[in-house]
Amino acid sequence: LFECVLSCDIKKNGKPCKPKGEKKCSGGWRCKINFCLKV
């Protein structure tokens, strides 16, 4: 896994990567390719 360089508005299962749709991939979120994972 790596810190997402794209904004965390990538969606998984039709829902925002982060609950409030924040643009930063901080707070435990990591993106792998186009998958958003909370770690």
From Swiss-Prot:
Primary location group: secreted
Keyword S-adenosyl-L-methionine recorded: no
Family note: Belongs to the neurotoxin 12 (Hwtx-2) family. 06 (TXP1) subfamily.
Lineage: Eukaryota, Metazoa, Ecdysozoa, Arthropoda, Chelicerata
UniProt protein name: Omega-theraphotoxin-Asp1a
Domain of life: Eukaryota
Subcellular location field: Secreted
Native organism: Aphonopelma sp. (American tarantula)
GO molecular function: calcium channel regulator activity; toxin activity
Function: Toxin that inhibits voltage-gated calcium channels in rat cerebellar granule cells (IC(50)<200 nM). Is lethal to cockroaches.
Gene Ontology CC: extracellular region
Tissue expression from the record: Expressed by the venom gland.
Keyword S-adenosyl-L-methionine among record annotations: no
UniProt keyword list: Calcium channel impairing toxin, Disulfide bond, Ion channel impairing toxin, Neurotoxin, Secreted, Toxin, Voltage-gated calcium channel impairing toxin
InterPro entries membership: Hwtx-2-like
SS bonds (residue pairs): 4-25, 8-31, 17-36
